Amino acid sequence: MRILLTNDDGIHAPGFEVLEDIARELSDEIWVCAPAEEQSGAGHSLTLHHPVRLRQLGERRYSVTGTPTDSVMLALRTVLEDKQPDLILSGVNRGANLGDDITYSGTASAAMEGALGGIKSIALSQVYKRDAEHELFDAARTYGADVIRKLIDAPFGDRTLININFPPLPADKVRGIRAVRQGFHDYSRGSVVKGRDPRGLEYYWFGLYAIEHTLDHGTDLEAIDEGFVSVTPLQLDLTQHSLLSVIGERFE
């Protein structure tokens, strides 16, 4: 099995080392194509207004001066053009990608790009607490390969990806694994801090600490809160089907 690895924290991020360890438990043919620098919050953006450079760092290992989406696109259209991967893994993100985080997540969007290319794609994220005493990626490192093994043969369907989050616990405290739906974050409560630079000019800095979420039953947010690994299938068809006929009647 040929596996392509990418992320949004950058190719030198600690979580990416964890992803490589996970991938080695699954296959001997690992390819890397990831952003050269931090790209958190890049979403599904493409670099359109300046050139992107692809740099080979070693055997089957490349960095990209662009976004996670750039990285996957370049890998599929250049490095792996004649030998497409069987699986794309994106992560392991340092931090949660739960609920509406998906909208902003470069980690999830890299997997989305893979799904658009018809390739099974999985995003992995490690939820963490700043005051935790255990090794940050312990749960992801311990559970990652086993969770992926159980998903590889699953019928993903067209334009579908899997989003996995690991709880902020030592591996021996994780309660299990749950298949759950996407939850809800209230991003309207996110903070915007206003300041002035040394020249006296105004600037704004976005923060996420004030975001609230709802622990609805059967959601990824609830699963993580209760100490479970969350596994959520996501589809790229964003159509609100129940509203489609209602709107259609207005144009008949």
From Swiss-Prot:
Q: Which GO terms describe its cellular component?
A: cytoplasm
Family annotation (Gene3D superfamilies) = Survival protein SurE-like phosphatase/nucleotidase (3.40.1210.10)
Q: What class of enzyme is it?
A: hydrolase
The EC code for this enzyme is: 3.1.3.5
**What cofactor does its activity depend on?**
a divalent metal cation
Q: Which UniProt keywords apply?
A: Cytoplasm, Hydrolase, Metal-binding, Nucleotide-binding
Reactions catalysed, semicolon-separated, are: a ribonucleoside 5'-phosphate + H2O = a ribonucleoside + phosphate
| InterPro entries tied to this protein | SurE, SurE-like_Pase/nucleotidase, SurE-like_sf
Pfam families recorded for this chain?
A: SurE
Q: Could you tell me what the cofactor note in this record states?
A: Binds 1 divalent metal cation per subunit.
Q: Can you tell me which family this protein belongs to?
A: Belongs to the SurE nucleotidase family.
Q: What does this protein do?
A: Nucleotidase that shows phosphatase activity on nucleoside 5'-monophosphates.
What is this protein called in UniProt? Answer: 5'-nucleotidase SurE
Q: Which gene encodes it?
A: surE
